[in-house]
Each structure stands twice: as structure tokens, then as C-alpha cells.
Amino acid sequence: MSPVVETADPHPLSWLDAVAERRRAAGLRRELRPRAPSADVIDLAGNDYLGLGRDERVVDGAVEAARTWGAGSTGSRLVTGTTQLHSTLERELAAFCGAESALVFSSGYAANLGVLTALSGPGALIVSDAANHASLVDACRLSRARTVVVPHNDVAAVDAALAARTEERALVVTDSVNSVDGDLAPLRELHAVSRARGAVLVVDEAHGLGVAGPGGRGVLAAEGLAGADDVVATVTLSKALGSQGGAVLGPAAVTAHLVDAARTFIFDTALNPPAVGAALAALRVLMDEPALPAEVLRVAAELARTAGVAAPPSAVVSVVLGSPVLAYEAAQRCLDAGVRVGCFRPPSVPEGTSRLRLTARADLTGAELDRVRDVLRRKVRP
């Protein structure tokens, strides 16, 4: 064996310092800010649209599940991780959304990775919207399918990509509600094109469930597409339902295939019982209080009016400020005044479109909404 010779080469991770400095200079450094459990701050940065994350009924659902099943699942869904609670949530979630079947994953991210990789692969085509969430982008990359990225909500471009395909199988993939701008995908038109071209439409309803459609059943339900035999949906349990986890909904043949083929289902520890219990309790609250989604949209319209932007068809209000420094400073001013808002900078959004993202909540009191409006008027564009 040759002797080890020490060199004057830099440390193999020294490049991280230069990258961090470039990010700092561009106003793109991110940091973790632990929050106190009862800070006197109104949160418009998270995704707890229905205000169920701290609802006593939802918390009780988590506590009861922990007492009955324990704090963790102890294994994957195929080993020890599937409890009767998981099955109940899947059954009730599918029924609520109008799907034949549902399969719960440990996160919405894992659900997207699992469904796209399992339904595509080499020899398949994925047509993906340019504004899709990072989890869908990563799923396309990992799928080994040929991926064509089309302009946001461009149905003609989707049709052209499908018409030119040589692959036997094809998927069209989109968010139902864009997570940054809050606009809706033209699902009815996308479904018509997909069906005509023999493709499956895969829709991420992360920001649709609990907010859009009849009683919060999602954009697919609003467009009359819930339960269609050539549509697959994914949802998250961590936004409107105030818990954690994700699920795939669609034909029973699809979820059965995922049990055999979705690596993020097979090899991942199952969603923990407290999260399942909380999600199930939140779903039942939503079923018992079908007016909650309309209240979210009312609050979103109020926030948009105050911020000087158009009212969105969802809970997401986007206020574009341009530079990352302007967005960061505005978010900090709002926080200092007692209102936490989202600050989106590249790479989360394109260059020159850094923005504040405000997320509406159904549980805001009149006094809280008045306070928010006052802060937005004074602090967003001082």
C-alpha cells in the first residue's frame, strides 16, 4: 500500500463557505427560527387553513391514538405500520373526496414521489406544469420517464406534448392550486385533453383539500372529476387538516399497485398513529362544519383587498415585491408588528418575483383580522 501523503488542498467541504457567502450577498440565506408555543403572533405563514392544528377535537384525536397505538408506527406499512386507524382514515378520506380508494403515506412529498415513480418509469412520458411543486419536480426526475415541462396552465402545450409522444404510457401532472400564486389549474380542460390522448391525469390537491370545492372536497370535486377512472389525486394531511402525512386517491387498481411498487410506501416507516388520529379527527370536523372552506375564502379576499392584489380562488394570497431583500425586510417588519407572513425568494420563485405569501385561516377572529389589516397597510410597503 502506498503511503498516505498529506496535501495542501483545501478541506473537501470548504466550498460551502463560498456558496453561503454568495447566498448572503444575494439576500437568499435561510435560517431556522424556533417559535414559542404561545407567542403573541398571528400566523399567516403556515398552511393551517381551517385553524384545526390546535383545535381541541383534533388534539384529542392525536392523544387518543397515541394512547391506543403508541407514539410511533414501529415499521413500514407492509410490516407493522398499518393499524386499524390507518384503514379508517383511508376509507373516510376516499369517501369524502369521492374516490374509490385511498392510501396513506408518511408525507405529501412521499405520496407524490411514490405515485409518479410507480405509474411511470422508462418508456413512459410525463407532461409536467412548469409551476409544479418541488415534490412533483423531484418525482419526475426520479421516475426515469421522459419528462416534458410545459408553460403554466397551458392546455394547448399539454395537448401538443401528448400528440407528439412515442411512449405507450403517459401522465399529465399538475397542482390543482398553485402553492405560490394561489391560482387554479384548468382541470376540466386538462382532463379532456388527457382522456382524448390516452393519458392519466395526476392532480396534487395539497392546497385544494379543505378549501376548494363543495364542503372542501377539492378542485377535482368542483370540476365534476372526483372519482374519474383516469384521474389520480394526491393530498396532504398537513395543511387544511392540521396534521401530518399524505395520501394517494384514485381507482382501487392504482392504490393496489402502489402497495407493490411505490418505494416511498414500501420502504418508509408508516405515518405515526397520533398524526393519523389527528387527521381523522380533522376530517370529521370538516364534514361536520362544511361552511369552514367558505370562511377561508372570505378571509383570503379580505387579505388580498388590504394588500392591493386580486382576490384569489384559494387560501393563498401572493404579494410580489420583486427583490429578495425587499421581500425579506417586509416580512420582518410584519413579524416585528406581530404578524408572521411567508417570504418566498429564489429558488422557490423565479428571479425578480420575490414575494410575501399570506395564507388565510378560517379561525381568525374579527379583532385579529383588523390587526392583520392594520399591519399589512403599514408594513408591507411603508
Describe the predicted segments one by one.
Residues S2, L52, E56, D60, ...:
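PLP-dependent enzyme catalytic core of the Aspartate aminotransferase-like
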Residues V115-A134:
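Conserved PLP-anchoring active-site segment centered on the Schiff-base-forming lysine
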Residues G215, A221-H257:
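Active-site PLP attachment segment
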Residues A270-E289, E295, V299, V309:
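Structural motif of enzymes handling amino- and sulfur-group chemistry
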Residues A294-G338, S348, G352-T353, A360-A362:
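Conserved PLP-binding catalytic core of the aspartate aminotransferase-like
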